[in-house]
Amino acid sequence: MNTCILKNIKYLLVFSFFLLMASCSSDDNIEKKESPTEAIDLARNFLTGDIVLSTHATLNGVNKTLLPTGCPTRFNFTWSTTEKQAFTIKLEDFTIGEMPFSITYVCDAKCMPLNSWEKKEYKGDGWLKFNGTNGYIVLEKDGKPSIMNGSFVKGYYNVNTHEINFIVDYNMMNVRSECFLQTIDKSRTSKFDAEFKKYEADLAAYKKEHGL
C-alpha cells in the first residue's frame, strides 16, 4: 500500500472521528432545544385530558398484564399554563399483580426534538419526544405525596398521526408501565369501565387456560 493511500485513510479516519463527535455533541444539546411551535400547538390541542391507552405493566421485567393486547390504562395530560412545551402526566390508582396497595404517579415532562438516532426509528414528520424525571408518588388514596427520585417518563408522540409510546419507570420495586406504540383513540375514554371489565374477564380466561 503506497504512502498516498495510507495518508488518505488517515485523513478519512480523522474526519469521521470529528464528524461523530459533532453529532454526539449536537444530540447531547437536543434537550435544551424547543420543539416547533406549530407542533406544540397541535399536541396541546389533542394530547390533553383523560386518555385511555393500552399498557404492559412489568415487575422485574415480567409482563404482569399477561395479555399481548395489554391492559386499558387511563392517563391524564395537563399542559402547563406558564411553559408552552411542558405538561404533567398523571396515572391514578395504578396497581399490578399482588401489590397490596395502589399507586398514583405524577410527573412533569417537557417536549423536545428527536435526536439523530431517534429519527431513524421514528420516521416521518410530526414526531416529538417528551422527558420527565423525579415525579412523585402517592400510595393509597389518602396517602401523602413523596418525590420518587430516579423515576422518569420518556416517550414519543406524533402530532399528525396521534401515534404514541412511552415508558413510566417508578423506580420502585422494579415496576414499569410500558405504553407500546399505538394510535390514540379518544372514544376509549367514555368506554373505559366496560373495556377494563372485558380485560379482567379475558385475563381470568387466560389464567384458567394456562393454569395460573
Question: How should each PLM-predicted stretch be described?
Answer:
Residues T161-E178:
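Ser/Thr/Pro-rich, low-complexity mucin-like regions
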Residues N2-L13:
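Bacterial N-terminal signal peptides that target proteins for export
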Residues C4, S26-E118, Y122-W127, M173-L212:
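Acidic/polar, low-complexity intrinsically disordered N-terminal segments immediately downstream
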Residues K90-E92, N131, I167:
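Beta-strand residues in well-ordered beta-sheet regions across diverse protein folds
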Residues L20-S23:
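C-terminal motif of bacterial Sec signal peptides marking the signal peptidase cleavage site
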Residues W127-N165:
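Acidic, glycine-rich flexible loop segments
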Residues I9, G143, H162, H210-G211:
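Short, flexible coil/linker elements and helix-boundary hinge sites characteristic
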